[in-house]
């Protein structure tokens, strides 16, 4: 993924004491966070406003427009005006009765035409520059600042294709307009020179991707070095990181948010795992129980014993006694057992006529005193032995399963066992699935194939029984943590870069804009250090949010051209110059062409020489 392509001479210069700064697992994760890979929340959308190059585009537009329109002289404007006036007088002979209105109309037409011509010339060519593809990326610059606080920059030569575009731009800028040749030519020439500088600067510097750069720290010289495609490049360290015991901690917003972001991400991952595990809602607690163990013993005796086995008969007696809960039921069971057993005995008292207990009475007494106790001890001993064998069986089964899983994992898809290749391929595919973004079936298969997950939900052993069952749907709450992370993102970006929120009447934030501090912190280093645009003046926070049309109007009002035109208007038609918009006469009001009171009180001045016929 990464181009660790430092040549041998460069690596020898680094020495063994160089500390890797980027790429490392920590630095790569910072860029992946900016790309939305881990816990992308609503507060991170402010970062999209931060990396928007619109403010830089307005700065370039303001610089080009202001520089071009200010590159004109009073003599050029006066020459163009005299030329225009002479042409008008040839076509429209003046009349003394309406000379004042004629001068006003003539000057208003010329000043408005001049403004529209200059505006069209500048905006058309500046738009071509702003919307053309440039090598320098403001978005990558913001990514490097927010992730590491350092910006690598690569110098590259201007291509021949770009030279051809600059040459064609000269033909468009340096043009001739009827009546405004000298002024428009001066403005167009300066626009071409300024545009050429901007285009060459924006296309001679390149900010590479974070996957293409290697950055290391040299403790001996206390400097950071960057390498791109095997050669050393410039590295602007705006916010130096902290290095302790070989660990690099960047001084950046994402580094400060790193811990909270991954806490939220792991919580979301935990919630997803719980959701997958609880897809089957019925869960059971399985344990060992001995209540029905006698059934296995009876089945064993039934298969292996003789037809009339004393052990079987006595065990049946004990089973029937345990199943009866009443005294009458126990009495009936004992009487039935004695009756069956006494039929096979010879009663010597009855045979020889001896007095005393009968055989049935003696048998009953013997059963109640001796036989039951002996058989109970024997059966308990057998039960203990069976339990031990069951535990030993389960232990060996677990060992066998563990050995099978290890063998299957070691063989893999290309192993010698063809029967295990298909399951191994399925397991490998399931293991590559992302739990958060992968399909539910693949994620569940991945969890069930994990050797550390005990996901059995059935009674597998002969000596196991369900102790309790319940419906489990627990999912860790993550909404509060996501909300906290959103607020933390907003607070970090607002306070680090001094952004200004724009809200509506209800207090809801619509968007954020650059403040004067944001321009100094973020746009200043990009303009003067990275792009090396030293003639460009930083845009003000007012222009950072205005539209292009509004910026044009503001720049034209404060330009030299507007001041020169206003001065010509005062000299040529002094009665109507006051109240005009920098020499451009406003439309008359609904009250008519009446003069204001302060104009009536002043004595009328003579027109300047050369004004009129």
From Swiss-Prot:
Coiled coil: none
Domain of life: Viruses
Gene Ontology CC terms: host cell cytoplasm; host cell nucleus; virion component
UniProt KW keywords: Host cytoplasm, Host nucleus, Viral genome packaging, Viral release from host cell, Virion
Record GO biological process: chromosome organization
Basic and acidic residues bias: start-end ranges: 592-605
Keyword Lipoprotein: no
UniProt region (Disordered), positions on chain: 577-613
Compartments in which it is found: Virion; Host nucleus; Host cytoplasm
Keyword Ribonucleoprotein: no
HAMAP family assigned: HSV_PORTL
Function (record text): Forms a portal in the viral capsid through which viral DNA is translocated during DNA packaging. Assembles as a dodecamer at a single fivefold axe of the T=16 icosahedric capsid. Binds to the molecular motor that translocates the viral DNA, termed terminase.
Subunit structure: Homododecamerizes. Interacts with terminase subunits TRM1 and TRM3.
Protein family per UniProt: Belongs to the herpesviridae portal protein family.
Record's protein name: Portal protein
Organism for this UniProt entry: Epstein-Barr virus (strain B95-8)
């Amino acid at each position: 993924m990464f181009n660790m392509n430092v040549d041998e001479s460069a690596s020898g210069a680094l020495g063994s004491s160089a500390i890797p700064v980027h790429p490392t697992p920590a630095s790569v994760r910072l860029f992946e966070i900016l790309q939305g890979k881990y816990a992308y929340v609503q507060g991170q959308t402010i970062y999209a406003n931060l990396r928007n190059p619109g403010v830089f585009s307005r700065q370039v537009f303001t610089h080009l427009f202001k520089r071009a329109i200010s590159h004109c002289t009073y003599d050029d404007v006066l020459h163009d005006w005299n030329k225009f006036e002479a042409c008008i007088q040839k076509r429209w002979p003046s009349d003394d009765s309406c000379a004042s209105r004629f001068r006003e109309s003539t000057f208003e037409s010329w000043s408005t035409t001049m403004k529209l011509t200059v505006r069209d010339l500048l905006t058309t060519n500046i738009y071509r520059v702003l919307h053309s593809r440039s090598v320098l990326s403001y978005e990558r610059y913001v990514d490097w600042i927010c992730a590491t606080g350092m910006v690598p920059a690569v110098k590259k030569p201007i291509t021949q294709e770009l030279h051809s575009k600059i040459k064609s731009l000269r033909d468009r800028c340096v043009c001739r307009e009827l009546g405004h040749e000298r002024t428009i030519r001066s403005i167009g020439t300066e626009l071409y020179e300024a545009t050429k500088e901007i285009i060459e600067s924006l296309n001679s510097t390149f900010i590479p991707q974070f996957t293409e750069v290697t950055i290391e720290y040299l403790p001996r010289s206390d400097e950071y070095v960057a390498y791109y495609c095997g050669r050393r490049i410039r590295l602007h360290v705006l916010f130096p990181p902290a290095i302790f015991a070989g660990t690099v901690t960047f001084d950046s917003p994402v580094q400060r948010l790193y811990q909270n972001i991954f806490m939220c991400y792991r919580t979301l991952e935990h919630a997803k795992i719980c959701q997958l595990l609880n897809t089957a809602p019925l869960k059971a607690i399985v344990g060992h129980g001995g209540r029905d163990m006698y059934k296995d013993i009876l089945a064993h005796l039934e298969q292996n014993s003789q037809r009339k086995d004393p052990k079987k008969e006595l065990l049946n007696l004990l089973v029937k006694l345990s199943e009866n809960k009443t005294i009458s039921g126990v009495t009936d069971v004992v009487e039935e057992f004695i009756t069956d057993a006494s039929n096979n005995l010879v009663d010597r008292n009855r045979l020889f006529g001896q007095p005393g207990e009968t055989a049935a009475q003696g048998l009953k007494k013997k059963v109640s005193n001796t036989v039951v106790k002996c058989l109970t001890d024997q059966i308990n001993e057998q039960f203990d032995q069976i339990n031990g064998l069951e535990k030993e069986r389960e232990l060996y089964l677990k060992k066998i399963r563990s050995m099978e899983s290890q063998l299957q994992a070691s063989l893999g898809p290309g192993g010698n066992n063809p029967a295990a290749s298909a399951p191994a391929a399925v397991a490998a595919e399931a293991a590559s699935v992302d739990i958060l973004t992968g399909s539910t079936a693949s994620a569940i298969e991945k969890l069930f194939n994990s050797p550390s997950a005990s996901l059995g939900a059935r009674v597998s052993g002969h000596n196991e029984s369900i102790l309790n069952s319940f419906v489990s749907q627990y999912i860790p709450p993550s909404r509060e943590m996501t909300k906290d992370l959103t607020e933390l993102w907003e607070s970090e970006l607002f306070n680090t870069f001094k952004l200004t929120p724009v809200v509506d009447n209800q207090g809801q934030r619509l968007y954020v804009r650059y403040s004067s501090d944001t321009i100094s912190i973020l746009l200043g280093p990009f303009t003067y250090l990275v792009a090396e645009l030293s003639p460009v003046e930083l845009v003000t926070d007012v222009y950072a949010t205005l539209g292009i049309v509004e910026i044009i109007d503001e720049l034209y009002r404060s330009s030299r051209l507007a001041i020169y035109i206003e001065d010509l208007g005062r000299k040529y038609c002094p009665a109507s110059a006051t109240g005009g918009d920098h020499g451009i006469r406003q439309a008359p009001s609904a009250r008519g062409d009446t003069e204001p009171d302060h104009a009536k009180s002043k004595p009328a001045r003579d027109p300047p020489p050369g004004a009129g016929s």
